[in-house]
């Protein structure tokens, strides 16, 4: 038996197991199994002997290719790279598979008193996912009661065919399907009366008919400029530095989601429900913009060293979600939402921004006596308007005993011995958007006026007008 693979029963072993279980429990034997009166052994009605692990698992393939070009001169360097990555999963069928293209351009340029840095990255990925559970299709890809691929591989009987040409049309075999052109597309299925009720799905059918694809386009651009102010005005002093730095970044992500769950994937038996057949299409757009301005002074006078920083940051995140889904499709399938019997859609849009100011001073004398103080002032769009600002101070002092003359140990034995005390406050605004505002909802909001049902709107959430920063003190 290969390493990490279950030692599963073959058809003869399973037939004996099932027959003995039925005899011991005094329950009817499924009609596909018979007891040979001469040998005393149980046999299935045909010679089907499927090793589901051999059928479902395959050798995965991964490849990665990269082209890189770099160069530059005395004051300028650049790097350009192209990358291709492809990974085929270890399961037969639609997933998991992953493909990605990436292009990157980096550049650095320096003059006497200013340094510029830029970085541009674009990537495109295409991912096929497998059926893992019955969670939300955006997460796992399945809706309703269904056996996932891995569990089905373990539970399917060896007497069930992996592929079966007779299942292309099952109308005359499945009573509930008589009004539809149901088929299993040539994959093996089982019948309660023949095989018994095992509540599992053919993992090959599930992982081939289920389509769950996500395509992602992402762009990230960053840039910075670092200015040596003293050099710019003609003052060059190695003991004093005054720098201004601006950081800019912007990212944009567009995701396109596609999920198709045909009726057979929904079923854990050969009888099924078209009402669970579902096509979902959606797009997700995310963007993030950041600007940072920082001015720093660093100076040394004798044994005194001081570093002072003042800065401002602003970050804005935007989210735009659009999802449409349709239920119950006629065959042959043409997978567009308007071809569904019932269609639904929803969309959401969010914006989150935070503005911060920061000041910090670090001081040490002879690298023995240490002092640091910081204060932040942050304002968040998630909090109530008149109390959305918070102030968060911190302070620390330290003493390096190992720098004192009376320190009893040699530096080769103890090279650092420091006592430090600190106090600080942290802030948290990790909540949902617009929770300080009343939200009106129109979903199923109806009222009866003299026998006439009227659709309206109503406040659907509780409003807290005192949403402020959550603060935590640290020592």
Regions picked out by a protein language model, each given a short descriptive name:
Residues 1-94, 169, 176, 181, ...:
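Residues embedded in well-ordered regular secondary structure
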Residues 63, 106-115, 119-124, 174-261, ...:
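Extracellular/periplasmic, surface-exposed regions of secreted and cell-surface proteins
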Residues 154-159, 262-264, 393:
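Proline-rich low-complexity regions
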Residues 28, 38-41, 48, 143-144, ...:
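Intrinsic-disorder/low-complexity loop/linker signature
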Residues 82-84, 262-273:
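A short glycine/small-residue-enriched secondary-structure motif
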Residues 53-130, 148, 156-160, 218-219, ...:
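Transmembrane beta-barrel wall of Gram-negative outer-membrane proteins
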Residues 1-34, 123-192, 417-447:
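A surface-exposed, glycine/aromatic-enriched loop/edge motif typical of exported proteins
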Residues 45-49, 53-54, 83, 106, ...:
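Short, functionally important structural connectors and interaction interfaces within domains
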């Amino acid at each position: 038996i290969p390493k990490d693979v279950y030692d599963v029963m073959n058809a003869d072993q399973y037939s004996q197991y099932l027959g003995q279980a039925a005899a011991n429990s005094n329950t009817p034997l499924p009609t596909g199994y018979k007891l040979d009166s001469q040998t005393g052994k149980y046999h299935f009605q045909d010679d089907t002997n499927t090793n589901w692990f051999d059928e479902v698992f395959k050798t995965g393939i991964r490849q990665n290719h990269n082209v890189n070009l770099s160069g530059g001169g005395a004051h300028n360097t650049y790097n350009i790279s192209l990358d291709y990555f492809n990974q085929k999963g270890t399961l037969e069928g639609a997933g998991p598979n992953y493909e990605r293209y990436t292009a990157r351009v980096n550049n650095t340029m320096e003059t006497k008193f200013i340094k510029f840095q830029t970085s541009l990255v674009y990537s495109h990925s295409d991912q096929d996912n497998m059926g893992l559970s019955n969670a939300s299709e955006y997460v796992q890809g399945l809706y309703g009661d269904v056996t996932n691929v891995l569990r089905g591989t373990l539970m399917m009987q060896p007497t069930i065919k992996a592929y079966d040409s007779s299942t292309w049309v099952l109308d005359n075999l499945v009573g509930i399907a008589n009004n539809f052109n149901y088929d299993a597309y040539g994959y093996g299925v089982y019948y309660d009366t023949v095989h018994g009720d095992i509540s599992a799905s053919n993992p090959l059918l599930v992982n081939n008919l289920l389509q769950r694809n996500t395509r992602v386009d992402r762009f990230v651009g960053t840039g910075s400029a670092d200015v040596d102010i003293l050099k710019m005005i003609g003052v060059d002093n190695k003991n004093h530095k005054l720098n201004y730095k601006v950081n800019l970044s912007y990212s944009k992500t567009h995701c396109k989601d596609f999920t198709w769950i045909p009726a057979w994937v929904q079923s854990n038996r050969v009888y099924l429900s078209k009402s669970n057949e579902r096509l979902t299409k959606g797009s997700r757009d995310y963007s993030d913009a950041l600007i940072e301005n920082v001015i720093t002074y660093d100076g040394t006078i004798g044994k005194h060293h001081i570093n002072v920083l003042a800065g401002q940051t602003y970050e804005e995140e935007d989210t735009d979600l659009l999802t449409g889904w349709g239920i119950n499709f006629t065959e042959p399938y043409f997978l567009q939402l308007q071809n569904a019997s019932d269609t639904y859609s929803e969309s959401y849009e969010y914006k989150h921004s935070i503005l911060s100011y920061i000041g910090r001073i670090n001081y040490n004398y002879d690298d023995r006596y240490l002092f640091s103080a910081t204060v932040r002032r942050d304002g968040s769009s998630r909090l109530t308007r008149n109390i959305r600002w918070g102030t968060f101070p911190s302070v620390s002092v330290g003493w390096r005993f190992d720098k004192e003359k009376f320190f009893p140990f040699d530096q080769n034995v103890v090279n650092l011995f420091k006592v430090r005390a600190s106090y600080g406050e942290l802030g948290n605004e990790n909540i949902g958007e617009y929770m300080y505002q009343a939200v009106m909802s129109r979903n199923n909001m109806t009222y009866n006026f003299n026998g006439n049902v009227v659709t309206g709107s109503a406040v659907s959430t509780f409003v807290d007008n005192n949403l402020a920063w959550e603060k935590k003190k640290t020592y």
